[in-house]
């Protein structure tokens, strides 16, 4: 008996993806993305009609696996639920294939002809308002479903989680819905182990022709525990109202997935909304080909997993795809519901059984209550995808038709993933009449494009006038922190535009020079736009605060009045590394670039050309930092027009200027220590006119090739100037001059004007015309070539009277005042022996000369009114550190330097400042440092470098370790040399020690004696010690800590002897007083030792070796010594052999022993070569070093033995080196040599003491200290040890 139930009615909440169809149909096309942002995504975040918590799966995707997607309503309650359970026969054959429809479904699915649509369709038995549940959860094998086309409902739920489902094979399947007044949603669920799609699948299609009844909505859920795949020819089509839920470990769809298919012919204007939910896919989701739109404005949504890959994405010209990535941490599951699969509670079910068909019919309980639920209001904002969310699209393509629409069409791709990557396939925009636009936006993350941008499948493809093609990319729309990166060169044809909004935009290259009339709109970039190469021609560029590595302005076609226009305020942080204006042919084929406004533009290199213009008059300040020159100086036809407001020529920048430059400066001009090269054309130079003020800033830097101050203005080919004519170089309302080296500047300052005039130089080829410095006959020839005096060139000996003099060409006069800078050329004068205009050059007295050049200097002592500021007559060669002190008027400091730092300090300063840099750098350093500080720093540096070169320093760690071991070995020899006893034999002594003790029963008395009685005979010993040591020498200190271990024994045969061996490890560190030299070393020491007895005579022999690996660094804090900072490493090694003889004087039954001794020893010390890791010119280098030492020693030792095992000793002695030889290679810094000679033969005094106590049977504690003092160098060394010994 079936119990009927009244259907309850639930209105759809306004946040559903399916309901979005009705909403968006009334919204202009351009607002689709905004709708997803303001409605859909807030709904996903905020939860939906069921009242779920924010961020839960059920709240976000209740149309997903919980089957409530459509309109976010609860599933429609069926009138009847049919159940089919697969029998046990389906559980037995895992390799068998079944037809799912024929085997299980057909008994509860009816079919018939749809006259309205002229097609056959299928439905659940009894009508589309019923449900079929198929329980085959234990079934195995493969089940094919092929040809189930136009399944119109109701719900179908197939649970086959251990089997494989093949959809398609010989025919496809289509799942759709039955449109009635209740707007039912068809839900089809397949839960399998694997699902493969082998033929087409349609979701929510219209039956047959589609002319009849409409479809409502359909949800197809495919869930597979292992994987979901589709073949290359298997197309999945989603029509309006379709939802596809995919849940698996991985999804790979090789066939085309088509979202937004037309439901019937002519449905171009009908809205289409479809959804794919992959949020339950644990791994990657791979769409080989995804198509959105079928000549309609389809809107599609993908609820994505962390990683989504799309091979080719085809968007119709007005379609939109929204890919929503999960938030950080993923979606949270909603608590499990207590409702059953049919949507009713498990109690009060009425079930009728049909045993023959293995089918149950379950009727819902009586329930006449009607429930009205109002639409859910969701108020929340969008969310960002998690930091690992990625959407990868290899190729993005749009499709278009020839439809003309005002404003064109816009296709869109929107996501919130952390990273949206478009691969090497790039982007293609299909353009037609009225224009097309593609919008790619990432609301909260970054966009990366690795491939080219194409129009109509052509790189550099163009659009027709009035039908512009527009690319729009927006990164971080909501976060304002996204980065858009384009890793391929972008080439845009005519009327093709590019718009990018982001926090930062990075471009490899942009070429709009293929015809022009493009717009590059980067006004939405809030931080920086970085472009490696920008090629323009008639391009509108809207950008602020940019870095352009190279800007090339082309002159393509007739472009009068059409220039590249930077149409926005460029800000204060814009920079172009290189500007190149290409050459035009004539005025109508010209080009140019202009700027709307801006605070500052920095250009490193600027190359201008004829018929190409640069108009920066609306930029407040432009600075040229390296080069300002014509790109065609050898072919200067045509004209350029270069226009600036305020222009600065930066330090060391060079400007080439001629009448072809056509330079206009309407504001101020600052030459900040740059050089202006004036080119003589037709006997004239072009005047540089400055609209307001000019400032000529110069310094005292020296041209090392000539000895002159570096010129601020050069006139090349000055011999061609028209004679008897004033040639005005620069005019301004007011001109000021400044010497940055001395910190002086001013207007109408005669001294500064005279200094400036000596930095105005005239050249004939490379030879200076206005002044000649003659040091030899070659200088005479050069002077003759400069002034056109052939006699001086051919017969230089006739002009030897000029040698040692500076001669001034009085045929040239210079003017530098507050309004103009000019030269007047009368023609060259001729030097004569007594003609004057010369200044004697004094004899150089410096022995350590580096060059014969001379340097100009302010107020030189030889200067007179005829030649002010002309040539410096220094007492030292130019290029020496002394000459720099002279130029700074600090000659007296030279003596101070030698007095307090010596020749070595002077040579080090020469190396650091001049040999590794130049005189200008040296001048800067000494100007910033007092003489006292210079000598202090040099002394600290030479001390540190002497340590670096010293072999004693390199051996310090090994010697401290060896000293520690010498103390330990002496203690071991003292211990094993015991002759003191209580005059009873060993056996009796051991029995006496057990007196009064009781033991458990043992096998024999011998066992008692062995286990519990102490042993007094000299045993075999294993010993280990912790060691530490330190060395103090001239304000530096070294420390060591480590461990030593060994084994020894007393041999009592034909010969009484002690033999032993040891090994030790110690880590040593070193730092000098200034903490500028720091070292750390791992050291190892190993060897053998012995003592032979002949009555009271003792003969000692010892051999050992040591190896240390050192890592050192120089760390100077002062700017003066900063180039010395570097690190290096090397190996140190040593080998030692010792022999000594001593005689024992015994007292108190051998309890007290006094032993004098003498000995000799040999040491071989060495270190490997090294080179520091520095890349500077003062990289430290040192060759290998090796020394052989011979010494003798005399010692006295007192030993006191007490008890049966303990002792104490004192040892003192003197060691004298009597010979040494070897090599100590020189350490070097560039030209500076550090030859640290070894100290003279040394005398050492040594004292040590130690002893041992018994802690337990056969376990002993020993302690010792040693002190060694070098009586020559006053260096001190200290070491101690604490150790244990075990005898057996």
Swiss-Prot record:
It comes from the Bacteria. SUPFAM superfamilies: Autotransporter (SSF103515). Residues 326-377 are annotated as: Disordered. GO terms for cellular component: cell outer membrane; cell surface; extracellular region; periplasmic space. GO terms for molecular function: toxin activity. Residues 1015-1288 form the Autotransporter domain. Residues 1-33 form the signal peptide. InterPro entries: Autotransporte_beta, Autotransporte_beta_dom_sf, OM_autotransptr_brl_dom, Vacuolating_cytotoxin. Residues 352-376 have a biased composition (Polar residues). Keywords: Cell outer membrane, Membrane, Periplasm, Secreted, Signal, Toxin, Transmembrane, Transmembrane beta strand, Virulence. The keyword Flavoprotein does not apply. NCBIfam families: autotrans_barl (TIGR01414). The signal peptide, cleaved at the inner membrane, guides the autotransporter protein to the periplasmic space. Then, insertion of the C-terminal translocator domain in the outer membrane forms a hydrophilic pore for the translocation of the passenger domain to the bacterial cell surface, with subsequent cleavage. Induces vacuolation of eukaryotic cells. Causes ulceration and gastric lesions. This is Vacuolating cytotoxin autotransporter.
């Amino acid at each position: 008996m079936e119990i009927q139930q009244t259907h309850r009615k639930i209105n759809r909440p306004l946040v559903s993806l399916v309901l979005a169809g009705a909403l968006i149909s009334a919204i202009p096309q351009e607002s689709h993305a905004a709708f997803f942002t303001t409605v859909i995504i807030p709904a996903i975040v905020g939860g939906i009609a069921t009242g779920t918590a924010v961020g839960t799966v059920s709240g976000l995707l209740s149309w997903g696996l919980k089957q409530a997607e459509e309109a976010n309503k609860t599933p429609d309650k069926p009138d009847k639920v049919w159940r089919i359970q697969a029998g046990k026969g389906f559980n037995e054959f895992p390799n068998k294939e079944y037809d799912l429809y024929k085997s299980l479904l057909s008994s509860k699915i009816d079919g018939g002809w749809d006259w309205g649509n002229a097609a056959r369709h299928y439905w659940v038995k009894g009508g589309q308002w019923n449900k079929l549940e198929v329980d085959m959860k234990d079934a195995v094998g493969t089940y094919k479903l092929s040809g189930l086309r136009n399944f119109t409902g109701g719900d179908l739920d197939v649970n086959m989680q251990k089997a494989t489902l093949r959809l398609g094979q010989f025919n496809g399947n289509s799942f759709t819905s039955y449109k009635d007044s209740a707007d039912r949603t068809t839900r089809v669920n397949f839960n399998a182990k694997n699902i493969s799609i082998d033929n087409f699948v349609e979701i929510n299609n219209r039956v047959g022709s589609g002319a009849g009844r409409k479809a409502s909505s359909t949800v197809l859920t495919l869930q597979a525990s292992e994987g979901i795949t589709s073949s290359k020819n298997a197309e999945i089509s989603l029509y309006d109202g379709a939802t596809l839920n995919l849940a698996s470990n991985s999804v790979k769809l090789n066939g085309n997935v088509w979202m937004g298919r037309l439901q019937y012919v002519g449905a171009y204007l009908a809205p289409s909304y479809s959804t794919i939910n992959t949020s339950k896919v644990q791994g990657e989701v791979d769409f080989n080909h995804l198509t959105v739109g079928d000549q309609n404005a389809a809107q599609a949504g993908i609820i994505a997993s962390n990683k989504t890959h799309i091979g080719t994405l085809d968007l119709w010209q007005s379609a939109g795809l929204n890919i929503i990535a999960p938030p950080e941490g993923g979606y949270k599951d909603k608590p499990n519901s207590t409702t059953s699969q049919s949507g009713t509670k498990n109690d009060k079910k009425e079930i009728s059984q049909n045993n023959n068909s293995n089918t149950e019919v379950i009727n819902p309980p009586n329930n006449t209550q009607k429930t009205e639920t109002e639409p859910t209001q969701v108020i929340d904002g969008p969310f960002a995808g998690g930091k690992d969310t990625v959407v990868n699209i290899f190729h993005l393509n749009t499709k278009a038709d020839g439809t003309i629409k005002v404003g064109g069409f816009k296709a869109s791709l929107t996501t919130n993933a952390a990273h949206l990557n478009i691969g090497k396939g790039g982007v293609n925009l299909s353009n037609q009449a009225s224009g097309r636009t593609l919008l790619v936006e990432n609301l909260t993350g970054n966009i990366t494009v690795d491939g080219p941008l194409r129009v109509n499948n052509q790189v550099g493809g163009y659009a027709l006038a009035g039908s512009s093609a527009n690319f729009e990319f927006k990164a971080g729309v909501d976060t304002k922190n996204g980065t858009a990166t384009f890793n391929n060169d972008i080439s845009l044809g005519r009327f093709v535009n590019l718009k990018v909004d982001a926090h930062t935009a990075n471009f490899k290259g942009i070429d709009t020079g293929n015809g022009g009339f493009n717009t590059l709109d980067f006004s939405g970039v809030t931080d920086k736009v970085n472009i490696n190469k920008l090629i323009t021609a008639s391009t509108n560029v809207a950008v602020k605060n940019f870095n352009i590595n190279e800007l090339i302005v082309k002159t393509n076609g007739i472009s009068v009045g059409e220039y590249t226009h930077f149409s926005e305020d460029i800000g204060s942080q814009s920079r172009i590394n290189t500007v190149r204006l290409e050459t035009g042919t004539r005025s109508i084929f010209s080009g140019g670039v202009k700027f709307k406004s801006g605070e500052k533009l920095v250009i490193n290199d600027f190359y201008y050309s004829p018929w190409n213009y640069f108009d920066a008059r609306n930029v407040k300040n432009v600075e040229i930092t390296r080069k300002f020159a014509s790109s065609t100086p050898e072919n200067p036809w045509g004209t350029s027009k270069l226009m600036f407001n305020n222009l600065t020529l930066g330090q060391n920048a060079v400007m080439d200027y001629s009448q072809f430059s056509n330079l206009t400066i309407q504001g101020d001009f600052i030459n900040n220590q740059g050089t202006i090269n004036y080119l003589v054309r037709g006997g004239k130079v072009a005047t540089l006119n400055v609209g307001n003020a000019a400032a000529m800033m110069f310094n005292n830097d020296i041209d090392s090739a000539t000895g002159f101050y570096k010129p601020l203005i050069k006139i090349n080919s000055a011999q061609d100037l028209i004679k008897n004519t004033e040639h005005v170089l620069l005019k301004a309302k007011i001109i000021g001059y400044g010497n940055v080296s001395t910190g002086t500047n001013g207007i109408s300052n005669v001294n500064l004007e005279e200094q400036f005039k000596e930095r105005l130089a005239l050249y004939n080829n490379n030879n200076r015309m206005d002044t000649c410095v003659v040091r030899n006959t070659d200088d005479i020839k050069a002077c003759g070539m400069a002034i056109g005096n052939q006699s001086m060139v051919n017969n230089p000996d006739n002009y030897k009277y000029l040698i040692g003099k500076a001669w001034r060409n009085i045929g040239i006069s210079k003017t530098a005042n507050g309004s103009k800078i000019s030269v007047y050329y009368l023609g060259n004068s001729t030097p004569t022996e007594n003609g004057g205009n010369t200044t004697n050059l004094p004899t150089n007295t410096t022995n350590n000369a580096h060059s014969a050049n001379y340097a100009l200097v302010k107020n030189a002592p030889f200067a007179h009114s005829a030649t002010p500021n002309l040539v410096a007559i220094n007492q030292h060669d130019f290029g020496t550190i002394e000459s720099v002190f002279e130029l700074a008027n600090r000659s007296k400091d030279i003596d101070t330097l030698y007095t307090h730092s010596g020749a070595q300090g002077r040579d080090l300063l020469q190396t650091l400042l001049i040999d590794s840099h130049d005189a200008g750098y040296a001048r800067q350093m000494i100007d910033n440092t007092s003489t006292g500080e210079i000598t202090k720093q040099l002394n600290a540096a030479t001390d540190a470098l002497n340590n670096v070169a010293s072999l004693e320093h390199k051996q310090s760690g090994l010697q401290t370790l060896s000293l520690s071991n010498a103390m330990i070995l002496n203690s071991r020899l003292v211990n094993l040399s015991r002759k003191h006893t209580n005059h009873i034999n060993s056996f009796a002594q051991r029995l006496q020690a057990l007196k009064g003790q009781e033991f458990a029963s043992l096998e024999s008395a011998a066992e008692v004696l062995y286990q519990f009685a102490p042993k007094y005979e000299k045993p075999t010993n294993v010993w280990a010690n912790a060691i530490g040591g330190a060395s103090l020498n001239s304000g530096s200190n070294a420390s060591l800590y480590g461990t030593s271990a060994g084994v020894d024994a007393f041999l009592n045969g034909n010969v009484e002897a002690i033999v032993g061996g040891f090994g030790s490890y110690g880590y040593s560190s070193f730092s000098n007083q200034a903490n500028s030299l720091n070292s750390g070393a791992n050291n190892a020491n190993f060897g053998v030792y012995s003592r032979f007895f002949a009555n009271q005579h003792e003969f000692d022999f010892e051999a050992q070796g040591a190896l240390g690996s050192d890592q050192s660094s120089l760390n100077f804090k002062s700017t003066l010594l900063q180039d010395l900072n570097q690190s290096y490493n090397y190996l140190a090694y040593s080998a030692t052999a010792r022999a000594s003889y001593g005689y024992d004087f015994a007292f108190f039954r051998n309890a007290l022993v006094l032993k004098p001794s003498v000995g000799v020893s040999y040491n071989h010390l060495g270190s490997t070569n090294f080179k520091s890791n520095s890349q500077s010119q003062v990289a430290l280098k040192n060759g290998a070093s090796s020394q052989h030492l011979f010494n003798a020693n005399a010692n006295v030792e007192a030993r006191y033995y007490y008890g049966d095992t303990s002792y104490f000793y004192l040892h003192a002695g003197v060691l004298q080196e009597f010979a040494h030889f070897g090599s100590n290679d020189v350490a070097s810094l560039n030209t500076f040599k550090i030859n640290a000679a070894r100290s003279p033969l040394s005398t050492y005094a040594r004292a040590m003491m130690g002893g041992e106590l018994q802690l337990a049977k056969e376990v002993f504690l020993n302690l010792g200290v040693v002190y060694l003092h070098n009586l020559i160098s006053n260096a001190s060394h200290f070491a101690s040890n604490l150790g244990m010994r075990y005898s057996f």
